[in-house]
UniProtKB/Swiss-Prot annotation:
The two isoforms were always coexpressed in the tissues investigated. The pigmentation of the chalaza-micropyle region is not under the control of ABS, as opposed to the pigmentation of the seed body. Interacts with AP1/AGL7, SEP1/AGL2, SEP2/AGL4, SEP3/AGL9 and AGL3/SEP4. One of its GO terms (cellular component) is nucleus. Residues 1-61 form the MADS-box domain. This is Protein TRANSPARENT TESTA 16. It comes from Arabidopsis thaliana. Transmembrane segments: none annotated. Transcription factor involved in the developmental regulation of the endothelium and in the accumulation of proanthocyanidins (PAs) or condensed tannins which give the seed its brown pigmentation after oxidation. Necessary for the normal activation of the BANYULS promoter in the endothelium body. Is required, together with AGL11/STK for the maternal control of endothelium formation, which is essential for female gametophyte development and fertilization, and seed formation. GO terms for biological process: integument development; plant ovule development; positive regulation of transcription by RNA polymerase II; regulation of cell differentiation; regulation of cell division; regulation of cell shape; regulation of double fertilization forming a zygote and endosperm; regulation of proanthocyanidin biosynthetic process. It comes from the Eukaryota. Keywords: Coiled coil, Developmental protein, DNA-binding, Flowering, Nucleus, Repressor, Transcription, Transcription regulation. Residues 86-176 form the K-box domain.
C-alpha cells in the first residue's frame, strides 16, 4: 500500500515547518552529492532557511566561489570587484571636483574678481544680474523691517491697553478709598453710577472729570472731600423757651 500524496502548500505550524525543512534539506543535499558522484557533475547548492540560516553544498570542497565565478562568466555576468568600486568612487570625486572648480570660476566675477578678461556685453549682463540680486535683497530686508514694525506696534498697543487698565483701576481704587474714609452713606446706585462714568473716560481725561465732580455741590466726591466747617470746640445747647423765661433759671 503506497503513501498518500501530500498537498504542496505552506505549513502554517512553525514547529512542523522547521522539522519538515530539516528533513528535506538533508535529503536534498544527499541527492545532490549522489548526483555529483554518479555523473561527475559540478554542483553548487545554496539554501537559506526562513530564519536566514545558510546551508550549502559544493561538489568540490572549498570551491564554491570558483563555481559561482564560472556561472557568472558563462552567463556574461561578473561580481562587483572592490577595486572597481574604488575606481568608480575616484571617478565620481574627480567629476565633482571639476564641477566645483567651474562654479568657483563662474562666481568670481560676482565678487569683483577677473573683470579685466570679461567682454563689455558680459559685463552688462553681470551688472543686470547684480542689480536684480540687490533688488531682491532690498525687498526681503524691507519685508523683515515691516514685520518688525508691525510687531512693535502690536506690542505698543498692548502696553497702552495694559497701562489704561491699570490707570483706570488706580482711580477706581482711589475713589473707593475716599468713600470709605469719608464714611458717607450714599444711595444704592449712586456709587456704581459714578464708577461707570469714570470708566467711560480715557486716562488723559480722568483729572478733568474729577475736577468737574468736585465742583458740583451734590457730587459724591464733593461730599467725600469737603472739610468740616463746624468748630469742634463750639458746644451746642438746645434752645428751651420755658427755661429762658423762667426767673429761677436766670438766678441759677
Amino acid at each position: 500500500m503506497g503513501r498518500g500524496k501530500i498537498e504542496i502548500k505552506k505549513i502554517e505550524n512553525q514547529t512542523a515547518r522547521q522539522v519538515t525543512f530539516s528533513k528535506r534539506r538533508t535529503g536534498l543535499i544527499k541527492k545532490t552529492r549522489e548526483l555529483s558522484i554518479l555523473c561527475d557533475a559540478h554542483i553548487g547548492l545554496i539554501v537559506f532557511s526562513a530564519t536566514g540560516k545558510l546551508s550549502e553544498f559544493c561538489s568540490e570542497q572549498n570551491r564554491m566561489p570558483q563555481l559561482i565565478d564560472r556561472y557568472l562568466h558563462t552567463n556574461g555576468l561578473r561580481l562587483p570587484d572592490h577595486h572597481d568600486d574604488q575606481e568608480q568612487l575616484h571617478h565620481e570625486m574627480e567629476l565633482l571636483r571639476r564641477e566645483t572648480c567651474n562654479l568657483e570660476l563662474r562666481l568670481r566675477p560676482f565678487h569683483g574678481h577677473d573683470l579685466a578678461s570679461i567682454p563689455p556685453n558680459e559685463l552688462d549682463g553681470l551688472e543686470r544680474q547684480l542689480e536684480h540680486s540687490v533688488l531682491k535683497v532690498r525687498e526681503r530686508k524691507n519685508e523683515l523691517m515691516q514685520q518688525q514694525l508691525e510687531n512693535l506696534s502690536r506690542k505698543r498697543r498692548m502696553l497702552e491697553e495694559d497701562n489704561n487698565n491699570m490707570y483706570r483701576w488706580l482711580h477706581e481704587h482711589r475713589a473707593a478709598m475716599e468713600f470709605q474714609q469719608a464714611g458717607i452713606d450714599t444711595k444704592p446706585g449712586e456709587y456704581q453710577q459714578f464708577i461707570e462714568q469714570l470708566q467711560c473716560y480715557k486716562p488723559g481725561e480722568y483729572q478733568q472729570f474729577l475736577e468737574q465732580q468736585q465742583q458740583q455741590p451734590n457730587s459724591v466726591l464733593q461730599l467725600a472731600t469737603l472739610p468740616s466747617e463746624i468748630d469742634p470746640t463750639y458746644n451746642l445747647q438746645l434752645a428751651q423757651p420755658n427755661l429762658q423765661n423762667d426767673p429761677t433759671a436766670q438766678n441759677d
